[in-house]
Amino acid sequence: MDELFEKRKKIIYEFICDEFYVPMKLKELSMLLQVPKDQKGELKAVMDSLEKEGKVHVTQKGKYIKGEAKQLRGMFQANARGFGFVTVEGESEDIFISEDDMNGAMQGDEVEVVITEAPEGKRREGKITKIVQRGTQRIVGYYQSRKNFGFVVPDNERFLQDIFVPAERSKGAVTGHKVVVELTSYGENGKKPEGKIVEILGHVTDPGVDILSIVKGYDLPTEFPEKVLNQAERVAKAVTTADMAGRKDVRSWQTVTIDGEDAKDLDDAITLTKEGDRYILGVHIADVTNYVQENSALDREALKRGTSVYLADRVIPMLPRVLSNGMCSLNAGEDRLALSCIMTIDAKGNVVDHQIAETVVNVDERMSYTSVKKILEDRDEEECERYHDLIPMFELMKELSHILRERRHRRGAIDFDFPEAKIILNESGEPVDIKAYDRNVATKIIEDFMLVANETVAEDYFWQEIPFLYRVHETPDEDKMKKLVTFLQNFGYTMHMQGGQEIRPKEVQKLLDKIEGTPEEAMISRLALRSMKQARYSPDNDGHFGLATQYYTHFTSPIRRYPDLQIHRIIKDNLRGRMNDAKRHHYEKILPEVAMETSSLERRADEAERETLKLKKVQYMRNFFGQEFEGVISGITKWGIYVELPNTVEGLVHVTNMTDDHYDYDEEHYQMIGSHHRKTYKLGQKVRVKMIDCDEISRTIDFRLVKERKEEREDG
């Protein structure tokens, strides 16, 4: 840019910054500044440049106002309805971006944004000024061919435009194929994004293509490189006497694993005895680091994956199966190397002593949650007879589990007990049933024992002042909690914020206790959860708000979570006397990156798992067009009523399908009221609905309310 242009920019910007400046259009500016006709184009160029820099902003009426010049950098998240948000690290609230202010940004891009509006008590609005880095190179979608070209409709609705594909770059794809398209142009200068087909996944109706599309869409690694597989085969050798040297031998201890029936990667085993009024609990975790050496091909691949991903019809493991289901899995009757946390716990649930040690274990029985539930809750004769010798230990487990749970409750730990779904598939991968996940005495035993082991290990290493990886859950943002408190007042609930600013876990726990069994329980629980921050990994011990503890880590699942594998490595270096200054410096250097990377990979896995679950629920419900169901109103918005069925499927009764009256949304009381007949729909209300539509692409289900016979008689 020449010197004159920059000078003009400076003069005009100073003019707009003047306190007496009144927002005006380009024509008005031109007249006021007495710009000659032949230079109006230059004025427009100056204003465009200032706008691009974020120094000025154009209102919806076309008037120029001063913009906030501070550039913020963050991640752009698009919304299927055409707008988006920028999430800035360290900022408590996202920035709203209108369709006109996206500046060509796409889902997942790293962008620079300036604040254009920050109204009191409302969400900030901004304008994207620069795309720092594109977040997506490849997109999965449905291919549609035309005469001389084709286009891909993205599966992910957050990608707001179809991708144009020239015929010569279609790789022979035909209409109906699910494909992976690589972007060659991001749609600059008002053009559509353009790409080339790099992989055809199969026809949309082919078995397994639906989930394969999700796998590819989230860029989940599937096949292991040959080098990694070869290394896994080499290290997966049976445990020898030499391997056991220097380890605590606990093979004679009565030991069990308790997992789901279909679990194959068994990374935790339990031992439990009682001496006087004290419990001796052993949580024995597979010693994966014995087989996965730091910076080996196996280790690099595990870090790249971050976690195993559990989808409806498949598991994408973090480690090759020869390790995850073989030598690292604590299979019954096999000698296995472990890292154990052996705790002495008093009658109040306090850990009064503990030992973290390298051990050798040999599991007596591979138990399932169902079997243990049958023994402890159902007193099933057949199961009790089969596992007669283990029953005293199971009874002790139930006893200690209750003590530990009560202790957590006393200190204020929060337990969001949302119903989870298990999808039952046939051989073709089609859903044939949906069952609510059974959270029973057996699942609670394992949950409680893993939690206490994780806390114990975290506290031990915090006080040793050794570089470590913690699982942190920070205190919720003050503004979000204030909004939640205001919302709760509509239902007659209160939550005390200390000093009017900080919330304590105990207050959230009290709220959940109060709403238990009420019509509004589901909605308030969800809103409370959304008001929380996401748990993440960190080298700093910032505490865990949800568990109401200062010390927490992930120690118990090194087969399927990289952070657990990472801290096992640190623990073993320490136990073996290798934690010298060089090692400390090494861990201090790598842990921030490991924490950030694994937190991100965990979120990716969670999203893929959620999408798969939503997809399979829609596929299941398409078999029930026109059928009626009993459900409960789980949410109410201005566009309709959300109804949840007993099997956890949720669908929307859109307000346009509520045809017996004109319904208005009462935002203050979260209800729908008919303007003529005054019929009211409230949270938690039982309703009967008919399934009228479902869409696999948007993963949505539509219901229509069914009149009860009594209502029909009254109408007649």
Write out the residue ranges for each language-model feature.
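Charge-lined substrate channels and their catalytic hotspots, especially those that engage the 3′ end
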Residues: 1-282, 289-335, 373-374, 619, ...
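Electropositive polyanion-binding surfaces
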Residues: 31, 185-186, 213-216, 220, ...
